[in-house]
Amino acid sequence: MLYLTIGKEKLIKASLEAHRKELRAIASQKEQDIASFLESFKSHAIDGLNINSIRYILNLQDLKYEFISNSCTAFTGMKPVDFYGKGLQILSEIILGKDFNALSKDLFPAMNAIVQELSLKEKYAVVFELHYHMQNNRTGKITPVVEYSSYADFDDQGRPYISTGICYESVLDFNGVRGLVRLNRGEEQETIYDRTIYYSIYVLTPSEKKIIAYLLEGKDYKWIASTEFISPHTVKTHIKNIYKKL
């Protein structure tokens, strides 16, 4: 079902902006300062703003987690020790099967290809955004998730080797996955990649596709009604039809 929870959305945006500021700051730091940044990142995992999120630090050279917050168990049923032992391979166990296939076969390769064309300075400014579903391997509960991640440091050849990320329960749930790549330029952002993969077997009308695009941007039904010069009731009817098709 497509829905919006404004309070939770504001909380996510506030935490994400704090994370972005941290990442912007390390772009000008010396290598020896990275360790203190990572320790600060870990400490934020237990504060009130991030208690309902998963924060992680991933070593991109050996694809092992250097840190994962304890809240990972509530989302996935897995304990931090499982993440440390299995590394990135654990994703196939905690992400819904069809989502994992779409991410690994389509979105990840395309997003990485875009980023490899960027300069080192631009890579420091990259923010990845992913929408998918986690599945708790103990309870079977499926949770829509939005994940934001960025590169934290690079080796001498300009290759990223440390990535930090945050996962939240998403305020938007749809039958598919989405991947975005943005460049953080001060107060402005440029989206350089945005693709959504739907699993629907039904054909959406042009109006329904437009409404989905608005919803993915975080617009509410009143805003959509005003922009498209239709009644709020019509927007709600479209959303019900979209839900049935998805």
Segment roles from a protein language model:
Residues 1-35:
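Short, low-complexity N-terminal regulatory "tails/caps" that precede and couple sensory modules
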Residues 9-11, 148-163, 170-176:
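Short loop/turn elements at sensory-signaling interfaces that couple input to output
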Residues 33-90, 185-193:
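PAS-family sensory domain signal
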Residues 79-148, 215:
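PAS-family sensory domains
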Residues 184-207:
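Regulatory hinge/linker segments at domain boundaries
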Residues 208-215:
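Short alpha-helical "packing" element that flanks the helix-turn-helix/winged-helix DNA-binding module
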Residues 218-246:
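Recognition helix of helix-turn-helix DNA-binding domains
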